[in-house]
Structures are given as C-alpha cells and as structure tokens.
Amino acid sequence: MSSSSKIDSEKPVMVSESLFSTKTPIKTVKRQIFSSSPKPESVIKLPERFEILEEFFNGLDTAIRLLKLKGSSTTYANICPKIEYLTNRIFSYDHLAQMKHIYPEAIELKRVLKFVEDTCCMKPRLHIKLNTDAIVVEDTICGTKYMELRKVFHSKLVDFRKAHPKDEIPKELLPEPFNSPQRDSYSGIVSVGLGEPKLEVGGFDVHMEEIEQEEQDVNKVIPDSTLSHIESRIVETPVKDLSTPSKDLSTPIRLMSATPTLQLSKRCIELTPEGGDDNSLRSTNSLARGPSRSLNFDTFEEDAIEKDDIGNESDDKGINYEEDGLLQSVKGPSRSLNFDTLEEETIVKDDISNESGDEKSNYEGDNASDDDSLLQSMIERPKTEPEKHNLPQLVNLIHRVFHSTNRTVITKEELLYKIIANQINITDRREVEEQLSLMLQLVPDWISETKASSGDLLVRINKMSTAETVRARLEEATSHDISLIY
C-alpha cells in the first residue's frame, strides 16, 4: 500500500511538470518568428533629402492618426505643428507637394472653406487624408495598413532614386491658393540645363522660346520676300517706341523752362529803355504784379551808382498810378531770389520799387477800409467768360460738401480746403476766398459767415434753399453787375 500510494502521489507532479515544460518552447518559437521576420529585408541607403521626405511622410501618418483619435479635423494647420515636433524640422507646402508626387494614390488633398469668427469670413483650408484603400493587405491587424503605406512610400522613393539619381523630386500641384508662390508655373514646359545660367525671371525665358518657335514657323511657311518685309517692319517698330519716351521726357522740361523765360523776357521787352520814352513801354499788368526784390551778388558798386541816378529821374516824372496801386494792393508784393539777373532788369526793379514806395505812403491810412475796397474792386473788375461760370459751379460744390457731411455749419478753413481739393482748375487759395466773399455778399440769405468764440470763422448755409434757385439768383446778380460795368 505504501508503494502504490507513493506512485500515485508522484504521477500528478510529473504530469504538471510535463505540461509546463511543453508550453515554454511554443512561446519562444513565436517570439523568434516575429523577431526574425524583418532581418531578411535589405535596407537601401537613400540621400539625405529623400530621408527627410520619408521622415515627413511618417510624421504625416502619425499626426493624422493622432488627430483622428482626438476627433479634430486633419487640416494642414493642425498637422504641420505635429510633424515639426516629431521630425524637429520645418514642414512646408513644398514637402507636401513632393510627397503627393511620389505617392499620389495614398495622399488625398481637398480645399475646404471654414468660417472665421474674428473676421466673419470664409477662409480656405487644406484638408489632408491618407487613403488606406490604396493598398490591399490580407492581415487586418490594427496599424498594419498604415505600416504598409510607409513601406510602399519607401519603395517608391527607392524607385525614383534609381530612375533619377541626380534630379530633384518634382512638386505636384496643390489646390489653390496653397501653391508655393516661388514655384514657376512653366516648370513642366521649360527644361533648363544644369550648366546653363538661369534668369531671375522665369516667365521671360518661356517668352523668348515662344518667340523663337514662332520665327521658325514663319521661316518655314512664309517666302523670303514676305519675310524680309516683316523683318523690316519689326526693326522699324522699336524706333518709334524709343522716340515716344523722348517726347514725353522733353515735354515737362519744355514747360518748366518756358514759364520763367516768358516772365523774364516780358520784363525786359516792356520795361527796358531802348533810347525812347520809358513811359510808353510800361504796362499796367507789369505794375500789378507788385515790386519784386532780387539779390544780385555779381555787381555792387555799379548797381549802387545806377540806382541813385534812376531814383532821381523817377522823382522828376511824377506819374499817377492810382488804378495800378489798387491792383497792387489786391495782388500784394512778391519776392524772389535771382542770382543771374541782367543789369537792365536790376535797374527797372529799382525804378519800380521807388515808385511803389511813394504809392505805399498814400494808402497807409486806409487800413480800416481794405476789405471793402477789396470786395468793391472784385465786383467792379470786368469778368471774362470763364469767370462768369465759376460762381454757379462753386454753388454746386459748396452744396455737395455740406450735404456730404450732413452739417449746416463748417469752418471756413475746412471749406476752402475741400473746395481746392475737389476743384481741379482752382489752385489759388486767394481766388477761392475772393469768390466766396463775393458770394457772401450776393446771396446772404443762403450762405453766411459768423465768428465763433474760439476765433474761428464759421460758414453756414440754408439747406431749405435748393442749389438751382441759388444758381439762378447768382447768375442774375452777376449778369446785372456785369451789364452795369459795361
């Protein structure tokens, strides 16, 4: 009994040991299969630019899977930071275009519009998707399809490296407006050699090749006589084009030089004594300009002697210039610096300055009535045909300025500025002030001027009156004044 019980007690121990001993080799064999499977594959060394692109593709795969797990949209704006974090490199649209060229079946790009709350506008976004249906895998283990995509992408890089060992990877076109601006749109048409110098403007190279191709086609079809005629016309055309800028360049120079030349010649002709009477050569227009003072550093002693002689002669003549003095008070004196004037012009200017000095003494006591005399001279002065139409046009402009601002009161400075800015043919502020003062007197019930407590002049209009009635009254008043003058 004791021997049989010992045998029975030893059997289960042996069975348990045998069971444990048989399971252990199975696990080791399975681990050896999985660990030894990638060893037979030979890895081909790729250049650095190809390895960087492969890293970007692997990062793209990882970023898209992470965004899907998070529930976020797989747009370029969301994917780019993750790829740059995984690869520690800058990821751009050019890299995406190169990956699209290598594996177009797996990378799907789509342009979508997203509403931006800050700007309340629709902004385009680039949606990126990896198409796992591009490959067929028998094993459906999680992650196998994405790993197979990486292997296929690597094999395609190897194939491209073998076919084009020295070429760069082309860039596939992306949906607009995500194409790189530096990329040449004619890159697929024009091929430039590696040793040839490249132009800075890519479109110019294409344009020159198209012109050469057209010339070759013309040489094949058109006979020699017609071709020579066409070439002569082509040669003549640039000559006309080159002459046009010269005219344009000469025009402002001619205008700029003509204006001072006319003024100087007019003074010399009208005021320079040539053996006759000086009074017969003087005109009221030249005196209306007022005395002009110049600085001449060339002659000092001779000018002083001549000035004394001319001053004595002008005192003996005693010419009355009351009307010219009034015009001079309107226009005011003008001063200029002239370093190259002639001696005759200097003599005439001193003569005018001496005469104007006598006239100033007659009008110094009338400062209180300057405004009244200015307005009276503007009314009594004969108006030409263009000046008759200025006041109605000014009414339209003032009416438009007040209605555009939705105000009935505006400062005089602002009104004058807007009139000069909106009226092309008016450049003189004094002319606008004269017309405005005349209008204040002719139609006071429509436009009036008051002085504010701050000292500014305020102009007010009556918006109840229409512009048509004001123009009619103004035309009637101006025509009546002109008829009285004539």
Curated annotation (Swiss-Prot):
Q: Tell me the organism.
A: Arabidopsis thaliana
Q: Respond yes or no to whether keyword Cell cycle is given for this record.
A: yes
> What UniProt keywords apply to this chain's record, in alphabetical order?
Cell cycle, DNA replication, Nucleus
**What does the UniProt function comment say about this protein?**
Member of the pre-replication complex. Regulates endoreduplication. Involved in the coordination of cell and plastid division.
GO BP terms, alphabetized:
chloroplast organization; chromosome organization; DNA replication; DNA replication preinitiation complex assembly; gametophyte development; regulation of DNA-templated DNA replication initiation
Q: Which gene encodes it?
A: CDT1B
Compartments (UniProt record):
Nucleus
PANTHER family associated with the record: CDT1-LIKE PROTEIN B, DNA REPLICATION FACTOR CDT1
Q: Where is the composition biased (Polar residues)?
A: 281-294
Compositional bias ranges of the Basic and acidic residues kind: 348-363
Extract the ranges annotated as region (Disordered). Answer: 273-294, 348-371
Q: What induces it?
A: Repressed by ABAP1.
**The keyword Nucleus is annotated on this UniProt entry:** yes
Official protein name in the record: CDT1-like protein b
Which GO molecular function terms does the record list?
A: cyclin-dependent protein serine/threonine kinase activity; DNA binding; DNA polymerase binding
